[in-house]
């Protein structure tokens, strides 16, 4: 497939300041530098947060009123646009078109599914969300323990339903992009993919612009930056970890940045605990200013795909800590802890001990900071360019 002059469409429901939104924007900028025309289609464009990356090579079109990802109205509109703009490749980040797949395939356009989660993340997310809900009501809790868990989890039926879903997605696409080589291997093994299907699964690491002169002299500041959502992010763990560590770190403080559905609960829990030197700061449109001041970043998620917050922290010389909850997290921080601190899932006591060690030991922290500055070079946009060139050549 000839790359220069190629027309590519990317369909995604909301374009704003989310991690994936930023990746999609930066990818458009990269494509434009390769001579590719990019056509974005979305339901909601948050114009103040998300700017068109390269107006000479990029366009943005809102889907018609009433359109959803995916329904018949959206599919009909996208098919019309594919023909009108002579689009050759349709990239679908995360939202599988389900029953409309055959219609999209009938257009003759190459279909690329771009996954931004670890394998079977939906399964793990729904289990965590369900656990949170049932805690609120005794009868639901008992039902969960004695009925739903044995039937769905012990028999594996629920997990198998998600495995079947993944097989359908991979089979229906020309290529399936995943976040790192380890995920490609995990999908092939967990789904028992035949060779012709396994060959469709291609790793594509998300990259970012390298910070030319990161600030290395930092404040005694620990931060959390991210979406406030219970099922995956578990920001309450940040508070519990600080409850264990704050007495040993009297000259350090914690700031929590973010917004989301769990915001009020996080605020209430923070007030309930009454801990010193920890505060909720809300949403920030300038995370780079936070990273400029911070020494340590905490990630306390139950599951993660390729958390951009970790590589953003490394890019600014902030030492990240995270539970070793996925291959993506382990790849970013390094199995040898050379570019961050991995914690056994989900030990709060170990997390607190390692946090105290990191904050107290200046030499140790400086060594990890240098490891972060070396590791971040693996995320340079040049590597992404090479990967995309190979992807287009395969289509």
Predicted regions and their residues:
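N-terminal strand-loop element at the rim of the active site
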Residues: 13-17, 30-69, 183, 260-262
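Membrane-proximal helix-turn-helix segments that form the acceptor-binding/catalytic region
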Residues: 135-176
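Conserved acidic donor-binding segment of nucleotide-sugar-dependent glycosyltransferases
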Residues: 334-348, 356-362
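Conserved donor-binding/catalytic core segment of Leloir-type glycosyltransferases
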Residues: 214-233, 239-242
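Aromatic "clamp/platform" in nucleotide-sugar-dependent glycosyltransferases that forms part
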Residues: 283, 302
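Active-site proximal beta-strand in glycosyltransferases
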Residues: 105-148
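Short hydrophobic beta-strand element within catalytic cores of glycosyltransferases
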Residues: 319-323
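Short His-centered aromatic/hydrophobic patch
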Residues: 92-98, 115
């Amino acid at each position: 497939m000839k790359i220069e002059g190629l027309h590519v469409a990317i369909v995604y429901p909301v374009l704003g300041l989310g991690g994936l939104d930023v990746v999609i924007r930066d990818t458009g900028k990269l494509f434009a530098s390769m001579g590719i025309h990019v056509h974005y289609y979305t339901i909601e464009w948050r114009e103040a947060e998300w700017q068109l990356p390269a107006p000479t090579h990029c366009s943005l079109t809102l889907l018609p009123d009433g359109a959803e990802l995916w329904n018949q109205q959206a599919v009909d509109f996208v098919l019309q646009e594919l023909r009108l703009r002579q689009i050759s490749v349709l990239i679908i980040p995360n939202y599988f078109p389900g029953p409309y797949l055959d219609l999209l395939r009938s257009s003759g356009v190459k279909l690329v599914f771009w996954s931004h989660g670890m394998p079977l993340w939906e399964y793990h997310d729904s289990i965590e969300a369900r656990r949170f809900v049932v805690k609120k009501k005794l009868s639901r809790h008992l039902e969960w323990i004695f009925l739903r868990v044995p039937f769905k989890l012990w028999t594996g039926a629920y997990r198998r339903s998600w495995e079947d879903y993944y097989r359908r997605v991979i089979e229906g696409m020309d290529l399936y992009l995943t976040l790192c080589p380890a995920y490609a291997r995990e999908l092939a093994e967990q789904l028992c993919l035949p060779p012709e299907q396994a060959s469709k699964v291609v790793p594509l690491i998300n990259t970012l612009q390298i910070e030319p002169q990161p600030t290395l002299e930092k404040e005694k500041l620990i931060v959390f930056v991210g979406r406030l959502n219970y099922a995956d992010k578990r920001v309450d763990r940040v508070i519990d970890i600080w409850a264990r560590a704050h007495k040993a770190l009297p000259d350090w403080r914690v700031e929590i940045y973010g917004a989301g559905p769990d915001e009020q609960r996080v605020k209430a829990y923070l007030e309930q605990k009454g801990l010193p030197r920890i505060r909720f700061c809300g949403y920030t449109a300038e995370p780079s200013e936070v990273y400029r001041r911070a020494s340590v970043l905490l990630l306390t998620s139950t599951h993660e795909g390729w958390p951009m917050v970790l590589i953003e922290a490394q890019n600014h010389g902030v030492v990240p800590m995270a539970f070793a909850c996925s291959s993506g997290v382990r790849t970013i921080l390094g199995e040898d802890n050379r570019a961050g601190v991995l914690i056994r899932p989900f030990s709060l006591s170990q997390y607190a001990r390692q946090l105290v060690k990191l904050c107290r030991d200046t030499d140790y922290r400086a060594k990890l900071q240098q490891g972060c500055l070396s590791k971040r070079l693996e995320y340079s946009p040049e590597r992404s360019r090479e990967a995309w060139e190979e992807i287009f050549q395969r289509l």
